[in-house]
Amino acid sequence: MKNRLVIIVFMVVTMLCASLALPLEEKEDEKDEKRSLEVAGAVMEGANLGMSVLQTILQAIGDVSRKIAVGVDNESGRSWTAQNAYFRSGTSDVILPHTVPSGKALLYDGQKNRGPVATGVVGVITYTMGDGNTLAVMFSVPYDYNWYSNWWNVKIYHGKVRASQKMYEDLYYYRSPFKGDNGWHERNLGYGLKSKGFMNSSGAALLQIKVMKA
């Protein structure tokens, strides 16, 4: 009888411990999922994209004098598929998120080349949209702020076009780029879409863009 009572008490205690541990495990899983979403190369809910997420990406890059965190929210109503990233200067250790459904945001980063080199981080990323056209995002974080400033641009190209030096020059010199002036800027992109974006003026640059229906 005594042994049976001990077994029953042990089973009750075990069940109570398990019931308490489950919510804790679920909370830890939620924390891990949230942390995993706030890294470059990931896709997250577009509504949750904000400067705090981009700051987390910058911190993960570490102590680099020229770096950028990019977040692009897809509210276009169509899914996007990654094409490529082109860097005129600088680099990234991150692969572009392959698929960005509507309602989601892609996260990406870039940094100057390692070592004592006088370069910034300048490049273009491209995505094929559901209608077959190409969304291009250009960013420029210079090394020398005595001569240059932060700039960014977003444009839709007809058909499938890969990011390249030619595309960079088009977006930087000829397509009315926006200065990284710590302010928001809007533009009609055509094809039934418009954009709204922000870039700061720092060497630790934040670029947040939302592409939505016009």
Curated annotation (Swiss-Prot):
PANTHER family per record: BRYOPORIN (PTHR40388:SF1)
One GO term (biological process): cytolysis in another organism
Keywords: Cleavage on pair of basic residues, Cytolysis, Ion transport, Membrane, Nematocyst, Secreted, Signal, Target cell membrane, Target membrane, Toxin, Transmembrane, Transport
InterPro entries: Actinoporin_PFT, Anemon_actinoporin-like, Cytolysin/lectin
Gene3D superfamilies cross-referenced by the UniProt entry: Cytolysin/lectin
Keyword Ligase: no
Subcellular localization(s) per the UniProt record: Secreted; Nematocyst; Target cell membrane
Protein name: Nigrelysin
Trp-rich region, which is important for the binding to lipid membrane: annotated segments: 140-155
Chief location category: secreted
Domain of life: Eukaryota
UniProt-annotated binding residues for phosphocholine: S89, V122, S140, P142, Y168, Y172, Y173
Residue numbers spanned by region Plays an important role in the hemolytic activity: 38-47
Reported function: Pore-forming protein that forms cation-selective hydrophilic pores in cell membranes and causes cytolysis. Pore formation is a multi-step process that involves specific recognition of membrane sphingomyelin (but neither cholesterol nor phosphatidylcholine) using aromatic rich region and adjacent phosphocholine (POC) binding site, firm binding to the membrane (mainly driven by hydrophobic interactions) accompanied by the transfer of the N-terminal region to the lipid-water interface and finally pore formation after oligomerization of monomers.
Any Gene Ontology CC annotation: nematocyst
Propeptide: 22-35
GO MF terms, alphabetically ordered: channel activity; toxin activity
Domain statement: Composed of a long N-terminal alpha-helix and a core region rich in beta-sheet structures. Before the pore formation, the alpha-helix binds the lipid membrane, partitions into the lipid-water interface and stabilizes the monomeric molecule on the membrane. Finally, it traverses the bilayer, thus forming the transmembrane pore.
Family per record: Belongs to the actinoporin family. Sea anemone subfamily.
SUPFAM superfamilies: Cytolysin/lectin (SSF63724)
Site keyed Important in the initial contact with the lipid membrane: positions: Y148
Ranges for region N-terminal region: 46-65
Annotated motif Cell attachment site, crucial for protein stability, positions: 179-181
Species of provenance: Anthopleura nigrescens
A family per Pfam: Anemone_cytotox
Signal peptide: 1-21
Complex formation: Octamer or nonamer in membranes. Monomer in the soluble state.
